[in-house]
Amino acid sequence: MKPYQRQFIEFALNKQVLKFGEFTLKSGRKSPYFFNAGLFNTGRDLALLGRFYAEALVDSGIEFDLLFGPAYKGIPIATTTAVALAEHHDKDLPYCFNRKEAKDHGEGGSLVGSALQGRVMLVDDVITAGTAIRESMEIIQAHGATLAGVLISLDRQERGRGEISAIQEVERDYGCKVISIITLKDLIAYLEEKPDMAEHLAAVRAYREEFGV
């Protein structure tokens, strides 16, 4: 685990974005942890979040021309990541996002920001069923652009309804790499360093045994 990944876990714990306990997911599964990126909800949170996304992007080595944030949750992520890339990595890249409802006045259309073209890096909070990615792919392909990759904050590394994860489905269906700031494996490595969190470690390991990919 790299220093920025450890720092991200601590940031998420401090903001109660990441919690350990017993939670029922939308799928009905009982999970020993819960991640709610919506609680990154202040200016400082967003500034820090952008730095972690930018760090993971640079670390990945994936070449891309533009950041795309799917509405709605991807919009502030794309914006803050673009700022962080410019401020901390000297990479001044364009970004854009979609509207859920196309405008019929003013500049019109369903996109805001830069023209959607070239190699697109899609940024979002998490991938649950992959629905937002599929909707975004329709937009990207309609503009003649290509998907360079997808970056999310957390990869839960767990099976969907079948034998593979929603993330593996996206990688298979679109031939792109999905990267994340942290994975379930990183969470377990972090818990292993914290004796006072041993009860959570056992529960998370058991969950991975049952649902992991």
From Swiss-Prot:
Its EC number is 2.4.2.10. One of its GO terms (biological process) is pyrimidine nucleotide biosynthetic process. Keywords: Glycosyltransferase, Magnesium, Pyrimidine biosynthesis, Transferase. Pathway: Pyrimidine metabolism; UMP biosynthesis via de novo pathway; UMP from orotate: step 1/2. It is an enzyme of class 2 (transferase). It catalyses: orotidine 5'-phosphate + diphosphate = orotate + 5-phospho-alpha-D-ribose 1-diphosphate. Catalyzes the transfer of a ribosyl phosphate group from 5-phosphoribose 1-diphosphate to orotate, leading to the formation of orotidine monophosphate (OMP). This is Orotate phosphoribosyltransferase. It comes from Salmonella typhimurium (strain LT2 / SGSC1412 / ATCC 700720). The lineage of its organism: Bacteria, Pseudomonadati, Pseudomonadota, Gammaproteobacteria, Enterobacterales. The gene is pyrE.
